[in-house]
Amino acid sequence: MKTVLAQGKTAARIALADAITPHSVGIGALAGLEGELTILDGVIHAARVTPNYALTSTKLTGSQTDDSATLLAICEVAEWETVLLGEVSSLSALETIVAAELIDRGFDMTRPVPFKVETTFSEISIHVLNNSCPIANPDGPEPWRGNFNTKNGHLVGLYAVGFGGELTHHGSDSHIHAIVLDGDVVNSSGHAESFALEPGSILYLPK
């Protein structure tokens, strides 16, 4: 992440068609920081900001896309186990829950672990990069930002302690993207900045 976001080295590094399988889950950024990538069960959600500052979010499999990523963190998970959640008040609260569940299951906490959540968001704020990173280029185009209330959706994340600047932002133990639905249709996707989850959300951890 440091190389891409802070140093501005945003060239294409990997073709998504070569990387994504039906069991892939992960997060990333499009080449040139043209947008955000969220991969859920082999489906690529690519969010981009249009010239008039609207958001488009496409939903494709690896074989259907010719997009490339400058930043991509994916894992292959064939089987998941589930945990029913109560109310989750914040992103940091979810981090605490995920950490406790991973420790309870004997995961190696020195290695990144993927997770996903099926949920109803009480509220959520996301952003999508707009051909620039405000860290490396504060005078560049502003990211698209969206706020939503009472929407169904998904979270896809990596829990990664000690990977600040590599897989997570400094000061965070996770890197989480969101897919926000409008009914059964994807409304938006992007990097999750903050959220609260209603009771009954389902946390998925690798089995």
Q: Which residues make up each language-model segment?
A:
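Extracellular/luminal recognition modules and glycoprotein regions
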Residues: 2-22, 76-80, 91, 150-162
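N-terminal nucleophile
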Residues: 57, 159, 187
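Short, hydrophobic/π-rich interface segment
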Residues: 131-182
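C-terminal structured interaction module
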Residues: 179-207
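N-terminal low-complexity or amphipathic/hydrophobic leaders
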Residues: 8-70
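Mid-length scaffold segments of soluble, non-membrane domains
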Residues: 87-144
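Contiguous hydrophobic, core-forming segments of folded domains
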Residues: 48-109
